[in-house]
Amino acid sequence: MELSWHVVFIALLSFSCWGSDWESDRNFISTAGPLTNDLLHNLSGLLGDQSSNFVAGDKDMYVCHQPLPTFLPEYFSSLHASQITHYKVFLSWAQLLPAGSTQNPDEKTVQCYRRLLKALKTARLQPMVILHHQTLPASTLRRTEAFADLFADYATFAFHSFGDLVGIWFTFSDLEEVIKELPHQESRASQLQTLSDAHRKAYEIYHESYAFQGGKLSVVLRAEDIPELLLEPPISALAQDTVDFLSLDLSYECQNEASLRQKLSKLQTIEPKVKVFIFNLKLPDCPSTMKNPASLLFSLFEAINKDQVLTIGFDINEFLSCSSSSKKSMSCSLTGSLALQPDQQQDHETTDSSPASAYQRIWEAFANQSRAERDAFLQDTFPEGFLWGASTGAFNVEGGWAEGGRGVSIWDPRRPLNTTEGQATLEVASDSYHKVASDVALLCGLRAQVYKFSISWSRIFPMGHGSSPSLPGVAYYNKLIDRLQDAGIEPMATLFHWDLPQALQDHGGWQNESVVDAFLDYAAFCFSTFGDRVKLWVTFHEPWVMSYAGYGTGQHPPGISDPGVASFKVAHLVLKAHARTWHHYNSHHRPQQQGHVGIVLNSDWAEPLSPERPEDLRASERFLHFMLGWFAHPVFVDGDYPATLRTQIQQMNRQCSHPVAQLPEFTEAEKQLLKGSADFLGLSHYTSRLISNAPQNTCIPSYDTIGGFSQHVNHVWPQTSSSWIRVVPWGIRRLLQFVSLEYTRGKVPIYLAGNGMPIGESENLFDDSLRVDYFNQYINEVLKAIKEDSVDVRSYIARSLIDGFEGPSGYSQRFGLHHVNFSDSSKSRTPRKSAYFFTSIIEKNGFLTKGAKRLLPPNTVNLPSKVRAFTFPSEVPSKAKVVWEKFSSQPKFERDLFYHGTFRDDFLWGVSSSAYQIEGAWDADGKGPSIWDNFTHTPGSNVKDNATGDIACDSYHQLDADLNMLRALKVKAYRFSISWSRIFPTGRNSSINSHGVDYYNRLINGLVASNIFPMVTLFHWDLPQALQDIGGWENPALIDLFDSYADFCFQTFGDRVKFWMTFNEPMYLAWLGYGSGEFPPGVKDPGWAPYRIAHAVIKAHARVYHTYDEKYRQEQKGVISLSLSTHWAEPKSPGVPRDVEAADRMLQFSLGWFAHPIFRNGDYPDTMKWKVGNRSELQHLATSRLPSFTEEEKRFIRATADVFCLNTYYSRIVQHKTPRLNPPSYEDDQEMAEEEDPSWPSTAMNRAAPWGTRRLLNWIKEEYGDIPIYITENGVGLTNPNTEDTDRIFYHKTYINEALKAYRLDGIDLRGYVAWSLMDNFEWLNGYTVKFGLYHVDFNNTNRPRTARASARYYTEVITNNGMPLAREDEFLYGRFPEGFIWSAASAAYQIEGAWRADGKGLSIWDTFSHTPLRVENDAIGDVACDSYHKIAEDLVTLQNLGVSHYRFSISWSRILPDGTTRYINEAGLNYYVRLIDTLLAASIQPQVTIYHWDLPQTLQDVGGWENETIVQRFKEYADVLFQRLGDKVKFWITLNEPFVIAYQGYGYGTAAPGVSNRPGTAPYIVGHNLIKAHAEAWHLYNDVYRASQGGVISITISSDWAEPRDPSNQEDVEAARRYVQFMGGWFAHPIFKNGDYNEVMKTRIRDRSLAAGLNKSRLPEFTESEKRRINGTYDFFGFNHYTTVLAYNLNYATAISSFDADRGVASIADRSWPDSGSFWLKMTPFGFRRILNWLKEEYNDPPIYVTENGVSQREETDLNDTARIYYLRTYINEALKAVQDKVDLRGYTVWSAMDNFEWATGFSERFGLHFVNYSDPSLPRIPKASAKFYASVVRCNGFPDPATGPHACLHQPDAGPTISPVRQEEVQFLGLMLGTTEAQTALYVLFSLVLLGVCGLAFLSYKYCKRSKQGKTQRSQQELSPVSSF
């Protein structure tokens, strides 16, 4: 039958040659269609598609709706294979334009029809589109009179929407049906005329505007009505003039053939001669056609094709039949039968040959494509809702291989040599474990909508099983998922990406059936834990790779090479694990979580090496079944492996004498479980292969030999840096179509989950143009698959977000859109060119060529309304002096205390830049030169390194890069300036540069599209040089020119820009440009020009303001101001009025110079006018150098700003100064001098003084009223070029916090904060040497790559939090400590006892040290100290004031044993401690005794001290004396206090006694070694001899700071922080509390450095095994001293340096926001207390802990109201309470110290005491400070009672009193006599009494006199007052 139809078509085509030049044998039309619901129902039944919702018997025309039926591509392809050339598509006018208007089309319907048309085009069927068939829009029925116009509009819409896909159009398919729809008209003729007019209009529109490439338009007429219709003038004219061919609806009744021929003959009467197309052919009652269809067609054509009338095609539906043999594929063919009955159809199916496979159909469809057709670029967009994203894998990027208890994975063990390039490992990788915020910022910069990442199984379950999940691991993924959600990014979580826990691999891994259960448990935990937020799950990522490379070739872990057995077994278990996991989710989680679970499979595309060889074609298909079908077929088809794969393995095994490959079999139950066990098919694809058939000539198993194929590549395919990836973009389209036809069949969506290519390390690491081309071509092929092939692809996910560890390739292959600097410890990420390109694709959702619509600005910013200015000037000095009165007396602690809170909800967070500093392109695209271009190109400009802004950051060419940064930062606003000379090259509006305008339009549109608010500065110092050539700002014409430029900007950009600033920092423009001449134009006229320039600038600003106000404000609704700059001025002596006035004057001369005229009264500040006027007069000038405004100008200037924009960076200390008069100078006019406090932190340009910001904001409010304020610049310049910029973090942290205080505490109306600057740039005279950027710019790289600094991440965090809210963990906790909690206070013998030589005491090393010059601050000594040796009673009072139950003190070794040995025991000294202990016990205070607190007897030091191993025995003997003599009274012993300090400070750096510093690399370790052994011996002595009888406890007190990493996202810093704590606290704790030996960190570091320095062993001594056993466990509790926290970071010392610090390799700093103390090393960091207590719990197996010291110092303290100490104690003790809540076994707390004392090398300068000791009073009284009362209340309350529960009695206490001072006999002078103090006091009292008596006597006499006088005047008038009484 196929052959007969070929003959028919050849015969019919012969008609097309009869006298026509339009048709040829190639374009004879054979058409099918249209789609009807009935047809779709039948087709869906044929294919077994139960998802289709078509009703049987519904013959209505199909109205397009999404999604298209999945079987259509297959149906259309079969039609094409049957010689069908065209297909009819009926549009639905009513559905496309439901409202009747082309302004509101139904876009979904439009897109649906486009997909349908593209599907036809893909199948090589040409669409024939009918504009209207039936059902008019309701709106047209009410407007009949305009029907023709309405139809014309609709036709125009259709031509525009679909014309690129359609070549043949029909206006109407049934005129009679349309007439029925029209409202009643007078006559049929008028109805026909209406339709004719509508058709004519459409025809004319089409041929005038849309008929490109030979498009045609017609109308369909019924054949039987031809004679009648041709008599109607409208139709006759239509047929002659307005059709390209005539179309007929023909019903051919074979019984009445003659009648039809007669009617058709009328066609010959039409002139000119027409071409005829049989649009619709019906053959009722024609059984003969089944036998001979050709005869029927020939008879029809004979009737038509006469006299040059030509038939160009016909409808072939009557001869078409479609069938299916397997419900998997469809076949359509032309048949002689008119209609097959059901029984006939079944017979037909059984006799049909097997249909072509999906692969064969795709190959046939594409094999003959021309290169031009194959590579044709499709300009279109992806469907709405398409997901764009990037991917990573856990083992590729996370690092943190041992963090948080993570278990070892199979990728973790170091591989054998040469396994990975460069011996790369993944311990750190890209360090994503610490960089969640950074990675999410990258995604935000990309505008990604989905992020595919994998979960590390061993990070969740370290041993692979779910008995004990790792909480830190769970927290990491929770943090990542939460951050993604906050950023609006969909998480796609992969459960398994090749990194099996090693613990499971040790039991066989994926070859052990039990791993399926383990995986299911792991997956179930992930679903339960993360599934509330994760809605896209991937069970396995590329299981083929794991099976092939991990178990087949052994290239990947676990390194098993068994391709015939292991790889198939592993795949088998993976599939079962996947299926069980999917069903578990489906049953247990889907109902609540509504997520989707799929699998990601990888596949190359395969094509035959020799297309003419059928065996190569079959091998190509087999390749796909082996690679993709191995996993896809069981899941997506029938639950089993592909038949091709099974057959091939069976054949292979038959050919060999033994089984080469063993393919496991699924049970029927397993098949049912597998089938359909995926909600989507994830696909990753990178390249294509050419495949040839491989003869079976070997029985050695390999992947290729088992598959029977051989892989090749076409060498013309471009090669990437990876040997296995060639660029073959069209392969992805074909693969997607194959997947759609073979597996998903439109029922399951496809997620493209991996596509990309690597670049090599030797390539340009930032300009990856090859990858850009790769993405461009591959993504476009995906678009073709969706649009032209109707493949249901839902996502495109690029591989990968960042560079990572690439398995065997190590780090040599870079797949990242972002470069990772693996040589930098911060693992900084920098976007590549491909990242920006990918963003552009995402923004356009594909490939748009049309210009984007202009966007409206984001409406998230609440702009203030216009504000009123004052009408009167500020006073001199201004009333703002109250700011100094309020703040200058603040204590430093109060001033600097960090405040927690947030800003207003609509607070505007931004970053800033300026045109000249970043744009570059100085002469590009018609830009004119500016004064800065001229200045930097002029020799001698004094710009460092002769730098210019010619390129700068190249922002003019890197707009995408800048927008990427802004999105990543999450800023709400971007402040930038417009280059006047880029817009107007000559400065005048007659020279508009369209390229410059376009740049700013694109910038503004990009900002608005990213929801970032543009803040635009019109002038940022870069005046067009052409205007400078006419005098610049000294020329009055500049005011008009500036107004013209501004007007243009308002008009051009104002629809999107709502925040304008006229000038940036005009003070610097005036002074630096025209005063000092440092800036261009370089005028040096300091006394006159600055004032003139400022005068002009103020007037120019006012002019522009009024222009905006009058012309644009009402429509654009923006605000306009100018950015003013100043620093804060702090009076050097706040109590000296002249200094306060000088500070105020400085502010008026800088800020008030411009702010006073604008925000107050239109004129300069009086202080300026006064000073400049007076000095001008003193300089003998006729008038003031300060110009004056006219009254009219004042009115014009006043109130010309809507908000106050402030730039501020630093502060100065100011005092009054009388400067020289001549030469005149603006600087001297201020009559003040400035300086900086050297203690302020230094920067590259100025010292930081953040507290000045708060004061400045308050001053502005006082001076200018409660006006909305925006900080438009604030930042810090550093010379450090690296991405680590902790100092910048501190700067922004403290400055923003001061702004927060101003907003929250002072009521300042602060609306926004804009950081300077977005990125490093050209910093004026500093060139590129000073870096202000949150982003680092590499100016040595032509690509100017931008890399986020640590400060960028911090600033994003501030923005996200909208300030600095108190973290939940830092909130104050109300509660009580456990019953029995011990409260104590501490001291130490040498620090308080004094009596250094009393009663036989021997010398200690501290006696010697303090008597040595230059050892102790202020030459202080401890000879007397607090004299506690003589003041037991007074010390008891201090303890009773505190209410403590315990007192920790130390015993002086040299007071008990003067020479350090037991040869002589000093009973007097011993008796002191007996009396002290008895006194304590009598007061119910328990002693806690420290045996050794640093004061070694000097005699022992003389023989080496702690470096001499004999000290161990000496210490044991000394302890024995104490146990024996005091043990019955003392039940709490501490052997050593802070051995770290003894070893490190005493023997390392020599800053403490004994001052040894010449052996820093060995002595500390030897001393530490002996200290540990001495402790152990003392402990064993007590344990063995005394514990049973005395019942006490004994341990050691170890001190340690807590260490936080300086950069928590930097693995090196994290490890440095750990190392800091292990070298400090762990040095001594690890041997005693853990295993008897030093920690591995110390041992490894010191050994490695010792060997590197040439030593043959470690400098750290080793314990013998017996010593380890004796040391281990020598504790009853953990005594712990803690004061502060540090920020630690890695610091590598040269190996030649031998010291403890060099071994530790850590540097430390303090956060500037941490409150200071009196000690340089002690910052108040309460949070660290809780953290280190928890660390002790975890590290040392939860020992009982007693805090044996904690407190804070104040330097030179005299105020008893020690609020800082109260803050310290309150917060630290509260953190201890939280630790108790954390289940830390904390038993007691000891405050350091009970009273001020001798603080070692700082002498008496630092005071830690809760009692003030007055050292200037010989009696040394102990006076309680406020902190003593506070601590006593905590002790009484045993914590912090909740005030919400009411007042608590424990909070009330009697006032504590000072201790009683002894009476001393001294002589004093009294009335010229030398008397004792007692006698002088008595005499004083006597004299005082006599004076008092004398005064009383005089008063009595006066009273008597007055009374008597009054009585003598009783006769006087009552109205007269007595002089005395009135007095």
From Swiss-Prot:
It comes from Homo sapiens. Residues 902-1366 are annotated as: Glycosyl hydrolase-1 3. This is Lactase/phlorizin hydrolase. Belongs to the glycosyl hydrolase 1 family. The chain crosses the membrane at residues 1883-1901. GO terms for molecular function: beta-glucosidase activity; cellobiose glucosidase activity; galactosylceramidase activity; glucosylceramidase activity; lactase activity; phlorizin hydrolase activity; protein homodimerization activity. The active site is at E1065, E1273, E1538, E1749. The keyword Cytoplasm does not apply. Residues 20-868 form a propeptide. It is a single-pass type I membrane protein. InterPro entries: Glyco_hydro_1 (IPR001360), Glyco_hydro_1_AS (IPR018120), Glyco_hydro_1_N_CS (IPR033132), Glycoside_hydrolase_SF (IPR017853). It is linked to Congenital lactase deficiency: Autosomal recessive, rare and severe gastrointestinal disorder. It is characterized by watery diarrhea in infants fed with breast milk or other lactose-containing formulas. An almost total lack of LCT activity is found in jejunal biopsy material of patients with congenital lactase deficiency. Opposite to congenital lactase deficiency, also known as lactose intolerance, is the most common enzyme deficiency worldwide. It is caused by developmental down-regulation of lactase activity during childhood or early adulthood. Broad specificity glycosidase of the intestinal brush border membrane that hydrolyzes lactose, the main sugar in mammalian milk, to produce D-glucose and D-galactose. The mature protein is composed of two domains that catalyze the hydrolysis of beta-glucopyranosides and beta-galactopyranosides, with a preference for hydrophilic aglycones (in lactose and cellobiose) for one domain and hydrophobic aglycones (in phlorizin and glycosylceramides) for the other. It holds the Pfam family Glyco_hydro_1. Residues 1647-1927 are annotated as: Required for homodimerization and transport to the plasma membrane. Disulfide bonds: none annotated. The keyword Cell cycle does not apply. The lineage of its organism: Eukaryota, Metazoa, Chordata, Craniata, Vertebrata. The gene is LCT. Its EC number is 3.2.1.108, 3.2.1.62. Residues 1220-1244 are annotated as: Disordered. It catalyses: lactose + H2O = beta-D-galactose + D-glucose; phlorizin + H2O = phloretin + beta-D-glucose; D-cellobiose + H2O = beta-D-glucose + D-glucose; quercetin 4'-O-beta-D-glucoside + H2O = quercetin + beta-D-glucose.
